[in-house]
Amino acid sequence: MKKLLKSALLFAAAGSALSLQALPVGNPAEPSLLIDGTMWEGASGDPCDPCATWCDAISIRAGFYGDYVFDRILKVDVNKTISGMAAAPTAASGTASNTTVAADRSNFAYGKHLQDAEWCTNAAYLALNIWDRFDVFCTLGASNGYFKASSDAFNLVGLIGLAGTDFANQRPNVEISQGIVELYTDTAFSWSVGARGALWECGCATLGAEFQYAQSNPKIEMLNVTSSPAQFMIHKPRGYKGTAANFPLPVAAGTATATDTKSATVKYHEWQVGLALSYRLNMLVPYIGVNWSRATFDADTIRIAQPKLASAILNLTTWNPTLLGVATTLDTSNKYADFMQIVSMQINKMKSRKACGIAVGATLIDADKWSITGEARLIDERAAHINAQFRF
């Protein structure tokens, strides 16, 4: 049985190095691995010993914490219907009608998944150990992210077929689905807290559990929207939140004179519980575990308008192309009808699509004072984690 357990854990740890795939689960035996201190000699405290003191029971470890998510499995969290848009145009030619009248429509972002979601964290790690069995730990560092999805996942909309030249109270009437939206965040302060403990030990095997919570609030550094009828890139985008984000947007939306705009900030929250099994092989401690986690990335459904000029220069207010379709001449009486107007997109709330995952890793110990842990995670994300620490 012991040989089978050793083989299974070693195979899992080796396999993870070949295919790197929530928060790290960590080695369940970690609280009891470093039993000697770099600065102070370790004391093996026994909670059943009447002469034991808290000085014997408590120790501190510190180190580096790096977590790198290459692809988190996320989806957008939106309602089934969207309000405020005008009805979709149906006329074979001419202009669209009723573009100032709101009509409830099916939300084309509903059920959409993100194509790519990356999250990188580098932090300092500090753990308070009790009786060489339980850890209470925290991390303080910095995180940044990248998100990519189809344009319909972020409600990219616009107005086509505008009659006349008055933009007041005009509402978008078409969705722009054949495009890509990319979000790059800046690097912002992040923190996490957690606890880990050994629940059961038998010889060299340890079964343990852990709980963690992490948070960060980075701002959107770059927004890139690529589609045929409208494309734009914004550095440090600003937009409308709350009731100000409702259609119709202000006429000045997207211009340099726009007011009541706010920075686009992504509020990241994640919590996780995990269970793992390890087996010590001298200096190497491989482990395998499962985790259940929930992550959310919420930007308060901020709506960001396409940049445009307040007044035309060389007959242009945006770089949007003219769309003639089957027409052979321009409609000079409705000069804004043939290209996309009042384009905007919304950063919808994103959350985990899969809650459960698997973690495999191994810890290398040196002199019972130093350790380095590598871990890979699969199913709910593809991620790698590294932790190097020492005991004081």
Curated annotation (Swiss-Prot):
Signal peptide: 1-22
Assembly information from the UniProt record: Part of a disulfide cross-linked outer membrane complex (COMC) composed of the major outer membrane porin (MOMP), the small cysteine-rich protein (OmcA) and the large cysteine-rich periplasmic protein (OmcB).
Keyword Oxidoreductase in record: no
Family: Belongs to the chlamydial porin (CP) (TC 1.B.2) family.
InterPro entries associated with the record: Major_OMP_Chlamydia
Keywords: Cell outer membrane, Cell shape, Disulfide bond, Ion transport, Membrane, Porin, Signal, Transmembrane, Transmembrane beta strand, Transport
Keyword Ubl conjugation: no
GO molecular function, one term: porin activity
Function: In elementary bodies (EBs, the infectious stage, which is able to survive outside the host cell) provides the structural integrity of the outer envelope through disulfide cross-links with the small cysteine-rich protein and the large cysteine-rich periplasmic protein. It has been described in publications as the Sarkosyl-insoluble COMC (Chlamydia outer membrane complex), and serves as the functional equivalent of peptidoglycan. Permits diffusion of specific solutes through the outer membrane.
GO BP term, pick one: monoatomic ion transport
Primary localisation category: membrane
Bilayer topology annotation: Multi-pass membrane protein
Gene name in the database record: ompA
Compartment(s): Cell outer membrane
Protein name in UniProt: Major outer membrane porin
GO cellular component: cell outer membrane; pore complex
